[in-house]
């Protein structure tokens, strides 16, 4: 019978509605002050990485020939200001254009136009330059063959060209119809000399 008694107690506990247990709040005064110590945040800044690529450094006396805020990388075509007689010059930057810039431009332009640059047997050419270089860069009009070329008149650009119209009065009536041969009846009705 002993086994029947615990079963009946379990059934009675299950049948009874559950009641909430009374709760108690107990506060204890603390005599020691509590301090919350948080670790301090450390911010470390690092500088930008140095660029590893090559960069070109121009001398202060190199002139921007194009006026576009950039300098050419072709060493033989960069203008270096003329040096005085008393100034020293090293062999790497010496050039034969030490006279004046306008004279050297006129000489080089006339040399290009007259075809004075003839190719030699080894392929090097001096294209009427006013400066020393190896001659392995392109020039306008350097097609060579040694023939003298006539200087061509410069052609006007698109803004300077006037549009071509048919010449008025090809058929002789003088009405400005463009000489189509159709007579005076061509065009938009109600406009022109017909309505007058």
UniProtKB/Swiss-Prot annotation:
One of its GO terms (molecular function) is protein serine/threonine phosphatase inhibitor activity. It comes from the Eukaryota. Residues 137-154 have a biased composition (Basic residues). The keyword Lipoprotein does not apply. Its main location: nucleus. One of its GO terms (cellular component) is nucleus. Residues 119-136, 161-173 have a biased composition (Basic and acidic residues). Keywords: Nucleus. It is found in: Nucleus. InterPro entries: PPI_Ypi1 (IPR011107). Residues 175-196 have a biased composition (Gly residues). The keyword Signal does not apply. Signal peptide: none annotated. Belongs to the YPI1 family. Regulator of type 1 phosphatases which maintains protein phosphatase activity under strict control. This is Type 1 phosphatases regulator YPI1. It comes from Chaetomium globosum (strain ATCC 6205 / CBS 148.51 / DSM 1962 / NBRC 6347 / NRRL 1970). The gene is YPI1.
